[in-house]
Amino acid sequence: LTTQAQRAEEARQQAISGGTEPSAFPDTLPGYTEYGRDNGIRLSAVWLTHDPEYPENLPAAPLVRYGWTPRGELAVVYDRSGKQVRSFTYDDKYRGRMVAHRHTGRPEIRYRYDSDGRVTEQLNPAGLSYTYQYEKDRITITDSLDRREVLHTQGEAGLKRVVKKEHADGSVTQSQFDAVGRLRAQTDAAGRTTEYSPDVVTGLITRITTPDGRASAFYYNHHNQLTSATGPDGLELRREYDELGRLIQETAPDGDITRYRYDNPHSDLPCATEDATGSRKTMTWSRYGQLLSFTDCSGYVTRYDHDRFGQMTAVHREEGLSQYRAYDSRGQLIAVKDTQGHETRYEYNIAGDLTAVIAPDGSRNGTQYDAWGKAVRTTQGGLTRSMEYDAAGRVIRLTSENGSHTTFRYDVLDRLIQETGFDGRTQRYHHDLTGKLIRSEDEGLVTHWYYDEADRLTHRTVKGETAEQWQYDERGWLTDISHISEGHRVAVHYGYDSKGRLASEHLTVHHPQTNELLWQHETRHAYNAQGLANRCIPDSLPAVEWLTYGSGWLAGMKLGDTPLVDFTRDRLHRETLRSFGRYELTTAYTPAGQ
């Protein structure tokens, strides 16, 4: 912490050592501001003074530094490398009113204000600029593409809420709030309303009802932790906690149970998890919450090393595989090296954008960026691709490696409406008020898309004739997909068990005129006691069964009672031997894991 007098003296000493005339830097600040009394004390630097993990190796520089103007305003921020990362400019007349700010390597964003201190303009030299017009209970926002949005508000002070929004395309969305400002309902541009029911005391959402009348319910314990959630399909998610409020068991909607164990009463991080298969995984953590080791269901261990800033510096896996990572003083990843010493290096610009990746063989892939940090040119393997953007940051032109172009157009809500490809073919897209695709055109081929009240796709027409249809049951699960093939109606019907898992697929072919069933075939699916899919039973054929171990690693397959294939895996669960009948396929890996 520094006082105003200390900062003033430091400024004078810097001016003297630099041989310049000292600037006006008062020893005191006005004692009172509209925000209260100002004693002039500011946070100027954060130092690491004690680290139990590295007690004898403390950094010589502060973790972060702050520079202040003579009026006590935050002027600059420096990271732990000493590089400036943020800067701020203030109004000459109004102390504390920011008129510009900049991220290092990015354009300066400037602001203008009205007489009441409200922002009226936001000026961005490399992107969208905005103007703001204020009226009673109404704010109009216009960007530099002349797109306009209007926000209508209700309430005062902390209870002021946006209750209506007029979008740039003329559509309107609305929101309703209760007396204490909690969201109760939202109406989309098509006039459909979603309702929210917050708890009277806690404000937590207890029920959400969608426009089609389907509802989801949420339940909490006295610590406001979610204990149960029931979706529109009736399936329930359940959670249990210990006396310290830590999650100890979660039951998924399909009935799978995951358990969590803790060995430290002061830690929220589990030391072990057990999934529905009974497989147990263990973890160890540092005092700072960093993962140090992970032991999988087979007892195989992966270890992790970190530096004092929490960045991962090494990963050590089974089979002798290790990977090492290096960072620069700003914390940017600059190198990754494997066990064999093969190193991939990374380079950045002053803004922190990744500009180059140098592979172990010396090949270089580079990326160039515009002022706003969007990639405009990428080079890989000697081939270059470039991108052009509009003021809104949307890609409007893509030039491929061979010099051909694809162009894009958007509507006022940033939705893609036209794409002209490398081959000159133009595709157009039309959306409804809520943003769903309802019509697409591909060089004269017109497709229409239709949806139900829950926004689920129900059918698609091509040139005015039905192409595909989708049907759903009352729980919202997909039950049928059908289409016309060579004049015949081909359909797939899906069946589910009580846990929502796929239980059957029934394929049918019907005569187009008489609807006579011409052909059908059914495939059933089965699951083991742990909830893993393990059998596929086609009509009139033996069942195909697969054997797994641990959390689901494939160990073998059989057709009926006849073994088809067996897999042998190493300590990383990679396939090393595949046996099928009298034949074997052996797979080996380099020390680097290739």
Protein language model regions, located:
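Extended charged/polar low-complexity repeat regions
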Residues: L1-Q594
